[in-house]
């Protein structure tokens, strides 16, 4: 790879194609060698594998123009929100893990939501994550829809179908912490690039790395990911997870306010509202 004048490394391949897998190999200053996924990649292998792969985000063509033009934040309207974990909502006997893909489950979910008068579906995090038991709250691929349930195009189809049936779609988003798995963000270049150095605020109560929101690398990644899901997948809102743990040091009000994180959250919200004025930020 070539190091650009502003510090970013780049590589151009004329032979690269959609579906091709890749990893980053990083050599630290001390000479250690690590392999990582692409935290900005649009697709990752099904766990326990973790290579990133090239995705064509223009493959699916949305047909929800009318919905997107007319939607609003619903702050002054009654909402009936159904929270869904896609992996356990309905068992698929034809799949060894019991999962339906995004396309297969769409009509089943929509039928259920309409029957019970739900106005919105709220999905537990759909970004890629290594552990099923985390329900998606410990991320490694912040721009990658989890491959457990199919492809990016299939997720777009699910959202599109919901909109055609006048059902809004919200996704849980995790801006506070990330998975400790070695191929992810943790000590990405051999230093504490996205997280805190070892301290009593470095590891969360869930055993994950807390984001250090004072660093520009972290701010860029998290706010870009939030914008990505709203822009590319037409989600109608994001529910920010574990915000109390971000506002206060260690989630403890007695320890005071984490001003860096509060500043980040304010700036991210302002930016998202400018770009997506009708999206809900919860």
Label the model's feature ranges:
Residues 67-76, 85-235, 239-257:
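Substrate-binding/active-site clefts of carbohydrate-active enzymes
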Residues 8, 106-108, 267-268:
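Short alpha-helical segments and helix-capping/turn motifs at coil-helix boundaries
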Residues 4-82, 88-97, 104:
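The feature marks proteins involved in alpha-glucan
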Residues 46-48, 234-236, 248-282:
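Conserved alpha/beta catalytic core and glycan-binding cleft of carbohydrate-active enzymes
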Residues 22, 140, 279:
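Residue-level detector of short, conserved catalytic/binding motifs and their immediate flanks
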């Amino acid at each position: 790879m070539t190091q650009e004048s502003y510090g970013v490394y780049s590589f151009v391949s004329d032979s690269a194609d959609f579906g091709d897998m890749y990893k980053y190999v990083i050599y630290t200053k001390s000479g250690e060698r690590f392999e990582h996924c692409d935290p900005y990649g649009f697709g990752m292998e099904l766990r326990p594998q973790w290579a990133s792969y090239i995705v064509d985000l223009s493959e699916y063509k949305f047909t929800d123009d009318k919905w997107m033009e007319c939607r609003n934040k619903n702050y002054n309207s009654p909402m009936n929100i159904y929270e869904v974990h896609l992996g356990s909502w309905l068992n698929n006997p034809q799949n060894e893990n019991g999962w339906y893909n995004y396309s297969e489950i769409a009509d089943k979910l929509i039928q259920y939501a309409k029957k019970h008068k739900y106005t919105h579906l709220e999905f537990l995090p759909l970004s890629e994550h290594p552990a099923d038991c985390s329900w998606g709250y410990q991320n490694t691929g912040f721009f990658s829809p989890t491959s457990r349930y199919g492809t990016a195009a299939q997720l777009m189809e699910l959202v599109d179908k919901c909109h055609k049936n006048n059902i809004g779609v919200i996704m849980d988003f995790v801006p506070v912490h990330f998975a400790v798995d070695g191929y992810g963000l943790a000590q990405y270049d051999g230093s504490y690039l996205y997280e805190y150095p070892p301290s009593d605020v470095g590891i969360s109560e869930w055993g994950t790395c807390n984001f250090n929101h004072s660093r520009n690398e972290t701010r860029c990644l998290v706010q870009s990911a939030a914008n990505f899901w709203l822009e590319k997948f037409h989600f109608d809102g994001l529910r920010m997870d574990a915000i109390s743990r971000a506002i206060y040091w260690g989630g403890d009000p007695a320890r005071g306010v984490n001003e860096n994180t509060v500043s980040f959250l304010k700036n991210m919200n302002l930016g998202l509202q400018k770009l997506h004025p009708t999206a809900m930020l919860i």
